[in-house]
Regions:
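Sec-dependent signal peptide recognition
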Residues: 1-8
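N-terminal signal peptide c-region/cleavage motif recognized by signal peptidases
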Residues: 13-16
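Bacterial extracytoplasmic/cell-wall-associated proteins, especially those involved in peptidoglycan
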Residues: 20-165
Length: 165
């Protein structure tokens, strides 16, 4: 009987430990890098480095473009809101932000990778310009209505990139 109780306790502890991912830095310490890391994680986790960099480069390009908000967090969180201020589901610039799912990264290795890359891009200005000014992208398996109104930049990994004409 003691064995079963101990096994149950160990399984519980292991599951709790798996559910908690490591943060290299907190949202309070580096808010812009943290927002960028979340966007890299949810938009391109598991993709090659060039694809992850390109997704982040689009966010930075939007920050520099007067048609978009002025900070990384504002760009990442941009979307339609209810009069109450709550985000309208599936009406955000980046789909993961208002899809109704938990936004806590679950894969520790991919989350650490996203945090490292975001920090390098935001605070060390690495990898800038890979998308040649692209402000839009989509996964290769979708055909958004807006794609024909923009100039095609090219494909990097699992995404197709565009900029204003």
């Amino acid at each position: 009987m003691k064995f079963y109780i101990m096994a149950a306790v160990l399984l519980f502890v292991a599951n709790v430990a798996q559910a908690q991912t490591t943060n290299l830095y907190t949202e309070e310490e580096y808010p812009q890098a943290y927002c960028m890391a979340l966007n890299i994680y949810y938009e391109a986790r598991g993709s090659n480095l060039a694809d992850r960099v390109a997704v982040a480069d689009v966010v930075q390009n939007r920050v520099r473009d007067t048609r978009y908000p002025n900070t990384i967090c504002e760009v990442v969180k941009q979307g339609r809101q209810h009069p109450s201020g709550a985000m309208i589901r599936n009406q955000c610039q980046f789909s993961w932000y208002c899809d109704g799912k938990n936004d806590r990264p679950q894969n520790e290795d991919l989350w650490i990778d996203a945090q490292m890359l975001a920090y390098q891009m935001v605070h060390e200005d690495k990898y800038r310009g890979i998308t040649e000014g692209a402000t839009h992208y989509h996964a290769t398996y979708v055909k958004p209505h807006w794609a024909s109104t923009l100039q095609l930049v090219g494909r990097i990994g699992a995404h197709i990139f565009y900029r204003w004409k």
